[in-house]
Design a protein with these regions (language model features):
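Feature captures hydrophobic
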Residues: 1-133, 150, 154-156, 162, ...
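Short Gly/Ser/Thr- and charged-rich N-terminal loops/segments
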Residues: 134-148, 236-238
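Conserved class I S-adenosyl-L-methionine
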Residues: 172-179
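Conserved SAM-binding loop of SAM-dependent methyltransferases across substrates and taxa
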Residues: 184-193
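Conserved SAM-binding strand-loop segment of SAM-dependent methyltransferases
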Residues: 216-228
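A short glycine-rich, Lys/Arg-flanked "PGG" loop and its adjoining helix->strand segment in the class I
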Residues: 259-271
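Conserved beta-strand signature within the Rossmann-like core of class I S-adenosyl-L-methionine
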Residues: 272-279
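Substrate-binding/catalytic lobe of Class I Rossmann-like enzymes that use SAM or dcSAM, i.e.
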Residues: 280-389, 393-395
């Protein structure tokens, strides 16, 4: 019978990864207990062992890319812990309104200083648009610039502008931003297109800084769960908006709440408005996320599939356009890590070494996941009744 080390070495060989090797994908093991930990706890054990310094990778993103591209995660993913997590998600609503603020406290309230150091100048915490075409609508500040983007700042500006163009944003439009973050898109939409925005977030720290960054602009920031916007009543339509955007928030909604989410969006959107949903997606339907990500980064988060979204919008929306630029998230995450790593000498006064290894593992393992095309980034444009004459796609 093969030892735990021999079993892991045989698996890694399928991904062309060598223990003790010198290539970017190779790893060094500092604690022999690693092998049993990974076999017993799967991806959770692998991530926690990295945080504990039990192993190191010459290039963590390259290693994870190799492992996922070779499908090695499937060889160790089903264990008692993951089975219990799946059962828990099936029987309970892990993203209920009572738990809605958990992710805000656990992730987005870590400290604005961390995100200011890691992100672009506008503090956009979603995928940048690096593959922006060199030509486009001359009405767009970004599309008419005549060049591809090269920096994180440019990629995020291109993404913000892409969202504005896809919903046909114009002066005077009032927009609901579900999961507004630090108000990045709201500020851009107001300054570049003359819109007004209501942004909602479950993070108190995000809301405080968003209000500061958007001071003096027609932007209202609310600390509010999406289910509290325009509640269903017998009193008519309630609060409605010309358009709705939701950038990087749907991953926190949870499968059991997808119908509720789109029901709320349907009630909030005017009859001729457009709703742009920007979300990370997965190629198969699932009820839970990676156990390490669930425990340390996004509690209660889960990535939707195309099938789950399609089923959830039935009767509420017409899908006008689906745009996948998931490969751009790899580039975005690598840029975020470069910024975070460069700022670490300053940040380490507030965070310990284990946090550094956790955050590094988060950013680089996700980069590897997008590089392996395990995860996608979708921008989906929805209308309530179909755009008369058809929707014109924007890239």
């Amino acid at each position: 019978m093969a030892s735990a080390r021999e079993f892991c070495e045989a698996l890694l060989k399928k991904a062309d990864v060598k223990i003790g090797g010198e290539r970017p994908q190779d790893i060094a093991v500092h604690d022999e207990r690693l092998y049993n930990r990974v076999i017993r706890y799967g991806t959770l054990g692998l991530g926690e062992a990295y945080m504990d310094g039990w192993w190191e990778a010459n290039a963590l993103d390259v290693f994870i890319h190799r492992v996922l591209a070779a499908r090695l995660d499937k060889a160790i993913e089903i264990n008692v812990a993951s089975m219990l997590a799946i059962a828990k998600a099936f029987f309970f609503n892990l993203q209920s309104s009572k738990r809605a603020f958990t992710v805000g406290e656990a992730h987005y309230d870590l400290g604005n200083d961390l995100y200011a150091a890691m992100l672009d100048k506008r503090m956009v915490y979603t995928c940048g648009y690096w593959s922006s075409p060199s030509t486009g609508s001359t009405s767009s500040p970004q599309a008419s610039s005549g060049h591809r983007v090269n920096t994180l700042d440019e990629a995020q500006d291109a993404k913000l502008d892409l969202v504005c163009r896809k919903i046909g944003l114009k002066k005077g439009d009032r927009v609901l931003d579900i999961g507004c973050g630090w108000g990045s898109w709201a500020k851009y939409a107001v300054e570049k297109y003359g819109a007004s925005v209501v942004g909602i977030t479950v993070s108190k720290e995000q809301a405080a800084l968003a209000r500061e960054l958007c001071a003096g602009l027609p932007v209202e920031i609310r600390v509010q769960d999406y289910r509290e916007v325009n509640p269903s009543t017998m009193l008519g339509a309630g609060e409605q908006f010309d358009h709705i955007v939701s950038l990087g928030m749907f991953e926190h909604v949870g499968v059991k709440n997808y119908r509720t989410y789109f029901d709320v969006a349907n009630r909030c959107l005017k009859e001729n408005g457009l709703f742009l949903l920007h979300t990370i997606g997965y190629k198969v339907s699932q009820l839970t996320s990676d156990p390490w990500i669930e425990k340390y980064i996004f509690p209660g988060g889960v990535l939707p599939s195309v099938a789950q979204i399609g089923k959830a919008i039935e009767g509420f929306f017409v899908m006008e356009d689906l745009h996948n630029f998931g490969a751009d998230y790899d580039t975005t995450l690598m840029a975020w890590f470069a910024n975070f790593d460069a700022a670490w000498p300053r940040l380490k006064k507030q965070y310990d070494e284990r946090f550094y290894r956790m955050w590094k593992y988060y950013l680089l393992s996700c980069a590897g996941g997008f590089r392996a095309r395990q995860m996608q980034l979708w921008q989906i444009v929805l209308s309530k009744n179909g755009v008369p004459g058809g929707y014109t796609s924007h890239r």
